[in-house]
């Protein structure tokens, strides 16, 4: 499996993070990862094909929102919650509040 590059959050402007969350599928992925656990894409059903989900996860990774880690033939993902909260204080808590309100 190829080496996956994760950007430093210091390099990511807030508009890129917000733009990445502009898709209902990507927002659903982030909400699912708010549990703080490591998941693989097959853990969830977002109503899209695997290739489409991979595309959405790539956008989230490039925006610094998720961490992808290869594990054999799987690719595990988790939310970069601590880093996001350090860069954008209160951001994760607001996502949790908004997620609970829906």
Language-model-derived ranges and their functions:
Residues 15-49, 71-83:
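N-terminal helix-turn-helix DNA-binding core of bacterial DNA-binding proteins
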Residues 62-71:
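A short, conserved structural fragment
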Residues 6, 15, 39, 55-56:
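Histidine (H) residue identity feature
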Residues 22, 31, 37, 57, ...:
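Generic low-complexity, intrinsically disordered sequence content enriched
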Residues 42-63:
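Canonical helix-turn-helix DNA-binding module
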Residues 1-14, 31-35, 80-102:
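Amphipathic alpha-helical dimerization/coiled-coil segments
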Residues 3, 19, 53, 68-69, ...:
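A broad, low-amplitude sensor of folded, mature protein cores
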């Amino acid at each position: 499996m190829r080496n996956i590059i994760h950007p430093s959050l210091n390099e990511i402007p807030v508009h890129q993070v917000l733009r990445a969350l502009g898709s209902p599928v990507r927002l659903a992925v982030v909400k699912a990862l708010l549990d703080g656990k490591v998941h693989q894409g097959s853990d969830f059903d977002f109503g899209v094909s695997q290739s489409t989900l991979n595309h959405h996860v790539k956008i989230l990774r490039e925006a610094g929102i998720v961490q992808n880690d290869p594990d054999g033939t799987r690719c595990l993902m988790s939310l970069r919650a601590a880093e996001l909260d350090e860069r954008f204080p209160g951001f994760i808590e607001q996502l949790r509040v908004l997620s609970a309100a829906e």
